[in-house]
Structure formats: C-alpha cells, structure tokens
Swiss-Prot record:
Lineage: Eukaryota, Metazoa, Ecdysozoa, Nematoda, Chromadorea
Cited Pfam families: FTH, HTH_48
Family in the record: Belongs to the FTH family.
Region (Disordered): 1-22
Protein name (Swiss-Prot/TrEMBL): F-box A protein 155
Length: 408
C-alpha cells in the first residue's frame, strides 16, 4: 500500500511536499497505515469521515478513497487483518476519481465491486453473512421515533431515547431466506444502511421506506435529509421494487426515485401526503416501470399518467371515489391502454351497485361480470370493499373469473 504519488512519478515530488515527516513514516509502513484506518472504525467514524480525517493528518493524496474504503470495510467486518495481502484491484484504483477534489457520489460509481456486505456497528453479523455467501435481496427502513436532532452538517446526532429507526435486511440463497432486523438510533441506522450500500453493486428485490407514527410528520425534513444524504453518497441503487409509505411529500418521493436505476426498476409504490405529480411522472424511473401502487388521495391526479403500466393498485382506506372518477378511469385507462393486465381497488368506500353501473354491467350481474372494450375483455370482480379488474385472454369463450395477484 503506498501513496498515490508512487503511481505517478511526475507528481510524486509535489505530493511529498504536502506530507508531514511523521506521516511519511506511516505511509512507508503498510501495517501502520492499516492500523490508522482500523482506528477510524474503532472510534465510530463512517468511511468518508475517517478518510477525510486521515487526509488532514497524512496528506490529501495519501490514498484513493476506494482503496481506503476497501481496507476500512474489510478491517471493520474482520474479513481483512492488518497482515492481509492487498488484493485491491490496481486497475480499479486508477479508474477512481480523486477525493476530496470531486464529490463522493461520483466516485462511488467506480469503486471496487465486492461481495462483502459489511455493517458498521454489527460486524459479527456481517462476517457470518459473508462467510455463508448470502446476497442482500431486500432493505427495509422504518422510522418510528420523532426525537431526532441534526447539526448543520447533518451528522445524524440523536437525543433522548431515539431508538426508533429499524433497518431490516433480507438475505437469500438457494435454500432459505434470512432476515436480520436491528433497531437503532437514527445515527447508527444510517451508518448501517451506508455500510450495506457503500461500494457494492447490490441487486435488490425490494427497497422499502416506511414512516410510522403520527408525530414523525413534524420531522420530515430531518429523516429526509438523512436518507437523501446516504443515497446521494452511494450513487445509483439497483432495485426491482421501491416502496415509499406514509408521511412523504411527492417532492421527497421524486428525489428518492432519482437514486434508483431506471429500466431495472419494475415496481413503484407511493403513498405521498399531497397530490402533486409533476416531479414524479417526468422521471425515467417512473416511465419505465411496469407496476404502480398508489395511496389514497392520489388517484385523481395520477390516472392521466398510468396508461403504460401493466399492473395497478389503488389503496383508498375508506376514502370515497366519485362515479365520475370511475368513468374517467374506464374511458382513459381500461379502454385505451394496450398494456394493462390487472388492476385492484382496495378499501374503496363505493357501493358494488354503483361500481357495476359505472362499467355498464348487466342488471343481472352480481359480484362478477365481463367488460369489453376495443376488442379486449376484462373480468371485473367485487369482493367487499375491493374491486379486481383482470384482462382476459384473446379467446373470449374461455374467460375465467380470476383475481389478479397483488404485486406488493
């Protein structure tokens, strides 16, 4: 392990001028330098914070950030020791963008991709997961406590008994599924999340954020800034399904969606506390997704932007829907969309008779009937406060009454 100047002889003399004599002694001893890196972890620093501190003491170009992160995370989860061989890919080091001259989010796209899912603050669990060769398949964040405090630099300080942030990580292999669930203060919850995301090309099935508790609404900006900071510093996340639930504005939802890989993202679940859709529907992540789930109060705004989805789900939780809205959905989505295969209205305070009438159902229809539009047919079924619409096969004589499976 050496300073960056040794890789570029033309600039080695300039780099050396900025390194204190004592620092040069450390940089020439691999074990001493690794000890300094390990010390940052033992003091509770996150990778970027530890890197910046060592830049101040050892010089701004003592090591590429991605190379530092390789050793920081390896020493933290005990997959590396002070005497381990340095197997960091040298070509990756050369490809990385220098820090701190450039924003860390840019460098995260080129850091070494590994299979190590290290967790600052829970190294033993991480080490077990690594050895067993599991893959992270889902990350679920639940914010339940509103007693949060931040300084101007968003250091994720906590006050009182702030232990209401839950980080749940799902691991899958061919034989079984394991869920690791930890309840942290916000500070350590964000460190835990960062450790799972940082420097790894994860392919997630689910990334879910749930805001629970009525008091959490007053701290929207605080947890939003915390999570936004982590996602921003770790670059693009690959996930098949993204779900943002409760006490979230459409602006915050749009900002979060930007961090997920468009084209790879298939399913989106949104439950915002406002009905503004402009920031969301213009995103490629939204345009390329195939399934959408919406919370109450958003249907009337979104129905003009949903004709490209294959699966739709609307959860109204007792909120009334006018007959006019049903007819607009019938004429603008059911009749026109060539992609729609299934749709579910859940917890809808709308009588079965009115729903059937809106779709011109025969008077004799009770519970289930077939609706035809533009040479296509749909089976519409009512079940209590739920209504299911499923596209039938092209052979109308073989229509079967069936329920669309929920995609969430």
């Amino acid at each position: 392990m050496s300073d960056r100047g040794s890789d570029q002889s033309s600039s080695s003399s300039d780099s050396a001028q900025h390194i204190p004599p004592k620092a040069q002694t450390i940089l020439t001893d691999q074990r001493s330098l690794r000890t300094c890196i390990l010390l940052q972890h033992l003091q509770g620093k996150d990778p970027m914070e530890g890197y910046n501190l060592l830049c101040k003491s050892l010089g701004p170009k003592f090591m590429e950030y991605s190379h530092f992160n390789y050793w920081f995370m390896g020493l933290a989860d005990e997959t590396l020791t002070l005497d381990s061989a340095d197997r960091f890919n040298a070509s990756q080091v050369k490809q990385c963008i220098d820090l701190p001259d450039n924003h860390p989010a840019m460098a995260s796209k080129t850091v070494l991709q590994t299979n190590r899912f290290s967790t600052v603050g829970d190294a033993h669990r991480s080490q077990s997961n690594i050895r067993e060769g599991r893959n992270v398949k889902g990350i679920f964040l639940s914010f339940e406590n509103s007693e949060l405090a931040f300084d101007d630099d968003i250091s994720f300080d906590n006050e009182q008994d702030d232990d209401g942030c839950i980080v749940e990580v799902e691991y899958k292999d061919d034989k079984k599924k394991t869920i690791s669930k930890k309840k942290w203060s916000l500070k350590f919850a964000m460190k835990d999340l960062s450790a799972h995301l940082n420097g790894k090309k994860l392919v997630l099935d689910d990334f879910v954020v749930i805001m629970g508790g009525w008091r959490i609404a007053q701290d929207q900006e605080k947890w939003f800034e915390a999570l936004q900071s982590i996602l921003h510093s770790n670059g693009t996340v690959s996930a098949k399904c993204v779900s943002f639930v409760s006490f979230m504005t459409s602006y915050q939802t749009a900002q979060f969606l930007k961090h997920f890989e468009s084209g790879f993202l298939e399913r989106i679940s949104i439950d915002a506390d406002d009905a503004s859709v402009e920031k969301i529907v213009c995103l490629e992540q939204y345009k390329q997704a195939t399934s959408l789930s919406l919370g109450s109060g958003m249907f009337s705004e979104f129905f003009k932007h949903i004709d490209h989805f294959k699966s739709l789900k609307f959860c109204f939780f007792g909120k009334r829907l006018s007959k006019n809205h049903i007819e607009l959905f019938r004429d603008n989505v059911i009749a026109k969309s060539v992609n729609l295969e299934s749709c579910t209205f859940e917890h809808l305070d709308f009588s079965e008779k009115s729903f059937l009438t809106a779709f011109n159902a025969p008077k004799s229809a009770t519970g289930s009937f077939v609706y035809k539009a533009n040479k296509r047919s749909f089976t519409i079924t009512s079940e209590g406060f739920a209504y299911h619409i499923k596209k039938n096969s092209s052979n109308l004589s073989t229509i079967k009454n069936s329920f669309p499976s929920d995609f969430f």
